[in-house]
Amino acid sequence: MKRNIFCHFMKNFHERLDFPPYPGSIGKKIYKNISKKAWEIWKNHQTILINEKQLNMLNKKDRKTIEIEMINFLFKNK
């Protein structure tokens, strides 16, 4: 059975994620407030950012950059 949540990003009810997609409190917040559809949109945007900015996910600074971009993308009003 699909569970719908009010997605903060989409501003509408959509299917909930199956599990927190990110560790820690940020992952819990995403799980409670972001839909599967919005998470897919973020993953596509994340790929573009990594490629355009030539980020290396083995580098801690680059991972922090993506984390900040993710929070801004999913939770900041447009």
From Swiss-Prot:
Entry GO terms, CC: cytosol
Protein's GO biological process: cellular response to oxidative stress
Keywords noted in UniProt: Iron
One Pfam family, short name: Iron_traffic
InterPro entries: Fe_traffick_prot_YggX, Fe_traffick_prot_YggX_sf
Any GO molecular function: iron ion binding
Keyword Ribonucleoprotein annotated: no
UniProt entry tagged with the keyword Lyase: no
Family as reported in the entry's similarity comment: Belongs to the Fe(2+)-trafficking protein family.
Subunit structure comment from the entry: Monomer.
Function: Could be a mediator in iron transactions between iron acquisition and iron-requiring processes, such as synthesis and/or repair of Fe-S clusters in biosynthetic enzymes.
Designated name of the protein: Probable Fe(2+)-trafficking protein
